[in-house]
Amino acid sequence: MADHHRDRGVLGGGALGERGSHGGYGYTGDHGGYGGDDEQHQQKQPVMMCALKAATAATAGGSMLVLSGLILAGTVIALTVATPVLVIFSPVLVPAAISMALMSAGFVTSGGLGVAAVSVFSWMYKYLAGKHPPGADQLDHAKARLASKARDIKDAAQIRVEQAQGA
């Protein structure tokens, strides 16, 4: 019966479910139990973990190295096969590529300007609906300054017209 409990880690004086100093359950660090010397166990674990980490890293690194070599070889073969075709068709492909680039730039520009127009219309709707969008205060201030300057110019023009008629 004692051997049965020793295998379960109960013999060391701790109860099942009680964590010992080595991080396991049941073994409390008593050297009379199943684990042998606790310090020796702690030293072996990091060495084994380092070896396991090194093996995992070597496996992952090796497979990535093999994959990168295969991709490089495939790229070289593809360029070797495609170069004569590109040289033969370059009088057609270069203008086609330029046309595609210009059309793509046109579509992107058109889309960007469309988004800008929608955002401006949205801002104007919010402003006219009285929802006070960002920048509405600046617009109101600029509108007031412009109206003030227009009044000043109108008054100055009226004064000059009256002076010209009176003279």
Swiss-Prot record:
Its main location: other. It is found in: Lipid droplet; Membrane. The keyword Transmembrane helix applies. The chain crosses the membrane at residues 69-89, 101-121. GO terms for cellular component: membrane; monolayer-surrounded lipid storage body. Signal peptide: none annotated. The modification N-acetylalanine is found at residue 2. It is a multi-pass membrane protein. Keywords: Acetylation, Lipid droplet, Membrane, Repeat, Transmembrane, Transmembrane helix. Residues 2-53 are annotated as: Polar. Residues 54-125 are annotated as: Hydrophobic. Coiled coil: none annotated. GO terms for biological process: lipid storage; post-embryonic development; reproductive structure development. May have a structural role to stabilize the lipid body during desiccation of the seed by preventing coalescence of the oil. Probably interacts with both lipid and phospholipid moieties of lipid bodies. May also provide recognition signals for specific lipase anchorage in lipolysis during seedling growth. Belongs to the oleosin family. This is Oleosin 16 kDa. The gene is OLE16.
